[in-house]
Design a protein with these regions (language model features):
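N-terminal leader/presequence regions that precede the main folded/catalytic core
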Residues: 1, 14-15
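Bacterial N-terminal signal peptides
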Residues: 1-8
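Intrinsically disordered, low-complexity linkers and terminal tails enriched in Pro/Gly
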Residues: 8-9, 164
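Exposed acidic/polar residues on beta-strands and adjacent loops within beta-sheet cores, strongest
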Residues: 15-164
Length: 164
């Protein structure tokens, strides 16, 4: 237990037990950004694996869905990272994962991810799409390079080395 005294207020914080962790320790960087919407009949983001969790309800076809994207890096045992993209649906009961995909372009590089940043930090974006930058090294001694992840209004994903 940790105690902290702030301007006459005593605050006590207790560490949560390891088994109650909300975010796995291997997730080293994450950002939630962008916006998507569909009529409920559209497929989830391109390249989604067959085992992706889906929030589409076949009995309620045509139900409008919308949400945002989450881009995150997961450290691997060899200290490199895999980068994943999630499509998060805003539902009546709160956020729900619509799909999760591994961005193979990053996995092929076996990168050391040093940061992930959204295009801006202004909060909710109402134009469909996503733009974020993943900073990575392919050699641990090198300087990081920026790689952009772009999702257009049609849901097509582009991953490419950033240009200055």
């Amino acid at each position: 237990m940790t105690s902290l005294l702030l301007a006459g207020w005593s605050v006590t914080a207790e560490a949560a037990p390891a088994q109650d962790a909300l975010l796995p320790a291997a997730v080293i960087f994450a950002t939630s950004t962008g916006y998507w919407e569909d009529d409920g009949n559209a497929p989830n983001v391109e390249r989604a694996p067959t085992g992706a969790e889906s929030v589409a309800n076949p009995e309620e076809e045509g139900t409008q869905r919308h949400g945002y994207y989450k881009l995150f890096a997961v450290r691997q045992p060899d200290r490199t990272s895999k980068v994943y993209l999630q499509q998060i649906a805003q539902t009546e009961t709160g956020p729900a994962i619509a799909s999760t995909i591994e961005l193979q372009e990053f996995s092929d590089l076996k990168p050391y991810v040093t940061d992930i940043r959204p295009e801006n930090s202004n909060g909710i974006i109402k134009q469909p799409g996503l733009f974020a930058t993943v900073y990575l090294k392919t050699d641990p001694a090198a300087e990081p390079d920026g790689w952009t992840v772009l999702i257009d209004e049609f849901g097509d994903i582009t991953v490419e080395k950033a240009t200055n």
